[in-house]
Structures are given as structure tokens and as C-alpha cells.
Amino acid sequence: GQDTIRKYTIKRLEKFKAKNDYGTEYKSVLCVISEYLYVQDLSEDIFSFEKMLAEISDKIIIVAESPGTFCELGAFVMDEQCRNKTIVINEDKEEYKNSFITKGPVKMLENRDEQSVILHNGLEWLKFSSVYDDLINKVANETLKIHINNDSKQIHLKSLIYELANIIEIFQPLEFFEIEKLYKKIKDFDNYEILNTEGHKIRSIKKVLVLMERIGLVKKDKGYYIINKKISCYNIMFTISRKEFNDVRIKYINRMDKYQPQRMEIL
């Protein structure tokens, strides 16, 4: 279909790659479109769901192009945690200058950080904009911030997602109960409590895996979870080199091939 500013921005961000020690390329940025992901199993309403997505995201980019996106912008800007991550791409029109959106949410973002607001005159203008180009590069090259979970009573959802992705990448393919068992064993947790669950229903690793599947971090095949091949999280929870990762992986695959050869068909 025809490019929109949102589609074009996603395409630009997803072009950024990172190489491992062996030259294999992986995506540096995983873009998620919130309204395509919402299901009632994960949250009672879309605003609570989007707030949860904001919690697990490094950046929130809102292309203000419809009443729905204006509502999102207002909701995110009113929440301090979300506001600090939000970037808005808004059309630069004379009639918008005194609008509620411009004087309210956009102004709040500008007061916090002028670089978090980009005003444009259409897609073709953006394609040649150095300001937009700088924004894309800044977002794509920003260091991922993850605080490893050490307290079973205060599990941060974002950290948990990457920790589980790390486990899956090393030991895939895995069933749900194996992932949970490995996580508890590695962490030495008897149980765990996920923080900030007031607005959503993600209180278990099983639900976290549903979310991870919907955002494209993992996929499920014949009941087994495997990592998205375009993404790598092997060194989130463990401080190991790629060689050490490969050594562990080869030993595990050889054992799996010997005792459960049917699993090899999933890879």
C-alpha cells in the first residue's frame, strides 16, 4: 500500500541492524503498533493496555494524524513515565497553532524537550528533513535500558520479557512450563510477582509469553516457543560471549537430538 508517515517511520527504524561476533545481522529496533495488539485477555481497555506497552517500550512515537492518535497523545503526556518517552510527529499547519493539541500536550512535550516534537509539511518533506533523520538515528542507536530482576516480589515486566527471550534463545524450542521452570531455577525464585498490574492482566509468565508472541519477539510452533530469528537477546541476563553461547547451544541441541529428536523439526 501507499506509504504513510507511520509506515515510513517504521520502515526507517527497522532498517537498523546490529551484528554479532560472527557477522550475523539482527534487528536493532522492534517496532510495535499498539492498536493491532490489543486483546481483552491482556487488558480490560485499550488505554490501560497502551500504558502497559509504554512501560515496556524505550520510546513512544505518535504520528498525530487522527482523533484516535490525538487521544493517545493526551493520555501519554498526562502520565509522567510515558511523557518522558513520548515523541510526536505533527503536521505544521496554521490552523493547528491555537488548537487544544498544540497548546496542551504538544506544548508540554516541547517544554520538557524540544527535540521530542517534530513539525512537518507532509511525507516528502520528512524524507529530506535532517531533524527527522537525526530523530530516527537517535532512537535506533539508543542503548536498551534493562534492570535485571533480582527481587521476586518486584518483577519489572520489561525486564522479564527480555530475560525470558534470553532463556528461549539459548534453550529453544521450549514449552511454557519449561520456560517458567528454567526462569525460577536460574533466578532461584520460588514464586514471582509482576509490578504495576492494576491496568492489565499480565500476572504470569504464561501471559507474558502471549504478549511476547503478539509483539513479534517470539513465535509458537506446535506448542513450542522459539525466538524471532531476526532478533537476538542472548546476552541480556547472562554475561557470556557469543562463543560461550554457541557452546552451550550446541551441547543442548545434541542432547535434544538424542532424547527428543522430534523437537529438532521446530528449528
Would you name each region that the model predicts?
Residues 229-267:
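Short, amphipathic alpha-helical interaction segments positioned at domain boundaries
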Residues 43-60:
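Donor nucleotide-activated moiety binding/catalytic core segment of transferases
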Residues 20-47:
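Conserved BB-loop
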Residues 5-19, 98-111:
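Short, aromatic/basic amphipathic alpha-helical patches
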Residues 209-223:
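A short, conserved structural fragment
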Residues 153-192:
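Short amphipathic alpha-helical interface segments
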Residues 75-118:
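Cross-kingdom TIR/SEFIR domain
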Residues 104-156:
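Long, low-complexity, charged/polar intrinsically disordered regions in eukaryotic proteins
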